[in-house]
From Swiss-Prot:
<feature type="repeat" description="WD 4">
    <location>
        <begin position="231"/>
        <end position="270"/>
    </location>
</feature>
<dbReference type="InterPro" id="IPR019775">
    <property type="entry name" value="WD40_repeat_CS"/>
</dbReference>
<feature type="repeat" description="WD 1">
    <location>
        <begin position="88"/>
        <end position="131"/>
    </location>
</feature>
<comment type="subunit">
    <text>Component of the prc2/eed-ezh2 complex. May interact with ezh2, hdac1, taf9 and yy1.</text>
</comment>
<comment type="function">
    <text>Polycomb group (PcG) protein. Component of the prc2/eed-ezh2 complex, which methylates 'Lys-9' and 'Lys-27' of histone H3, leading to transcriptional repression of the affected target gene.</text>
</comment>
<dbReference type="Pfam" id="PF00400">
    <property type="entry name" value="WD40"/>
</dbReference>
<protein>
    <recommendedName>
        <fullName>Polycomb protein eed</fullName>
    </recommendedName>
</protein>
<keyword id="KW-0804">Transcription</keyword>
<dbReference type="GO" id="GO:0035098">
    <property type="term" value="C:ESC/E(Z) complex"/>
</dbReference>
<keyword id="KW-0805">Transcription regulation</keyword>
<dbReference type="InterPro" id="IPR036322">
    <property type="entry name" value="WD40_repeat_dom_sf"/>
</dbReference>
<feature type="region of interest" description="Disordered">
    <location>
        <begin position="1"/>
        <end position="70"/>
    </location>
</feature>
<feature type="repeat" description="WD 2">
    <location>
        <begin position="139"/>
        <end position="182"/>
    </location>
</feature>
<keyword id="KW-0677">Repeat</keyword>
<feature type="repeat" description="WD 3">
    <location>
        <begin position="185"/>
        <end position="225"/>
    </location>
</feature>
<comment type="similarity">
    <text>Belongs to the WD repeat ESC family.</text>
</comment>
<feature type="repeat" description="WD 6">
    <location>
        <begin position="356"/>
        <end position="396"/>
    </location>
</feature>
């Protein structure tokens, strides 16, 4: 992978030499020609991810949703669209992530991925978005789907992991502007990357090859493979660690959600041994654990591809192509999730967040750092933001964000760590910045 930026010394994240000026880049009222908001980056050619093969309108009927819908009411959060940009490859942008590992006072930096491009931007006051760096994969057929931030535990440098259609994970150091590592192992495209919430070296990847993999990027070892006998039977589309990093919930095209514990003695030992492994001191390769059996599995939540899942405390938020994010938990309401058995067949659905015009797959929601807000875009450029800070989930309030020129499918959203900025990326290669007013 080559970078479009020149090499710069120093500990601060270097910027691209051809920086966009504030006149080209900052557009607080979004007036004038859209071309004024275009970021000039080398172009590439790639195809979109296909639409969902089954129409949600024709999906089979389902039983009741437990305690009812989470109706939309006026939300206490308000946002204003202050800027937009367009990357000139004109291919869908599938992923966006703010770097939440920055310190207070540091610039607000986010990364976007799409086509064979990885691009870093910095948010400035008054709505400005400044282009910092752009990386282009040598293979024009690469199509990046996902990215995740971490940091080097020795130098504290920010690191960005990216992956996509070729199934290769690349680790980029924005300080040195180099792709410092890459990992090959998955037999097909990688749909999502996630770093452990308490260990910056543990990277989780989920793939079209039906499996999840856990990597230690400090020692370059593959700790474990989750899949096989009772694993996913089709593409794994999303996964998430719980806040303590003890459990993983995964979901995929087989309509299922699966729980994998990584705080078992077997997994704790494997992680410890991955840190102790030194290829210079042994001729033996590291032995990866193969986890064939999840600790819980269900297909009772969704009737279509499950393309996004996130933990909310001990509860699960997941969505399919059915115009609703479902809040649920394994077992019965009173059950302790840490004591749920693999044979458990019960699930408790607590409610759902409803929205409209979002029945294509690979549309991912996000939460802010403190899990007080939930954001999702639909296929016509509309953003939904829910206030999660309510005692009764049925009273979760929603605000809908629209802007006339934003009319393409919003693939992913990301909040800045301080929740002051919400960024959305779209199928038409556009990036939209919304600033919080209160």
């Amino acid at each position: 992978m080559s970078e479009a930026s020149g090499r710069t010394a120093g500990n601060e994240m270097p910027a691209k030499k051809q920086k966009l000026s504030s006149d080209e880049n900052s557009n607080p009222e979004l007036s004038g020609d859209e071309n004024d908001d275009t970021v000039s980056i080398e172009s590439g050619t790639n195809t979109e991810r296909p639409d969902t093969p089954t129409n949600a309108a024709n999906a089979p009927g389902r039983k009741g949703w437990g305690k009812g819908k989470w109706k939309s009411k006026k939300c206490k959060y308000s946002f204003k669209c202050v800027n937009s940009l367009k990357e000139d490859h004109n291919q869908p942008l599938f992923g966006v992530q703010f770097n939440w590992h920055s310190k207070e006072g540091d610039p607000l930096v986010f990364a976007t991925v799409g086509s064979n491009r990885v691009t870093l931007y910095e948010c400035h006051p008054q709505g400005e978005i400044r282009l910092l760096q752009s990386y282009v994969d040598a293979d024009a057929d690469e199509n990046f789907y996902t990215c995740a931030w971490t940091y080097d535990s020795n130098t504290s440098h920010p690191l960005l992991a990216v992956a996509g259609s070729r199934g290769i994970i690349r680790i980029i150091n924005p300080i040195t502007m180099q792709c410092i590592k890459h990992y090959v192992g998955h037999g097909n495209a990688i749909n999502e990357l996630k770093f452990h919430p308490r260990d910056p070296n543990l990277l989780l990847s989920v793939s079209k090859d039906h499996a999840l993999r856990l990597w230690n990027i400090q020692t370059d070892t593959l700790v474990a493979i989750f899949g096989g006998v009772e694993g996913h039977r089709d593409e794994v589309l999303s996964a998430d660690y719980d806040l303590l990093g003890e459990k993983i919930m995964s979901c995929g095209m087989d309509h299922s959600l699966k729980l994998w514990r990584i705080n078992s003695l077997r997994m704790k030992t494997a992680i410890r041994e991955s840190y102790e492994y030194n290829p210079n001191k042994t001729n033996r390769p590291f032995v990866s654990q193969k986890i064939h059996f999840p600790d819980f599995s269900t297909r009772d939540i969704h009737r279509n591809y499950v393309d996004c899942v996130r933990w909310l405390g001990d509860l699960i938020l997941s969505k399919s192509c059915e115009n609703a994010i479902v809040c649920w938990k394994p077992g019965k309401m009173e059950d302790d999730i840490d004591k749920i058995k693999a044979s458990e067949s019960n699930v408790t659905i607590l409610g759902r967040f409803d929205y409209s015009q979002c029945d294509i797959w690979y549309m991912r929601f996000s939460m802010d750092f403190w899990q007080k807000m939930l954001a999702l875009g639909n296929q016509v450029g509309k953003l939904y933001v829910w206030d999660l800070e309510v005692e009764d989930p049925h009273k979760a309030k929603c605000t809908t964000l629209t802007y006339p020129k934003c009319a393409s499918a919003i693939r992913q959203t990301s909040f800045s760590r301080d929740s002051s900025i919400l960024v959305a990326v779209c199928d038409d290669a556009t990036i939209w910045r919304w600033d919080r007013l209160r």
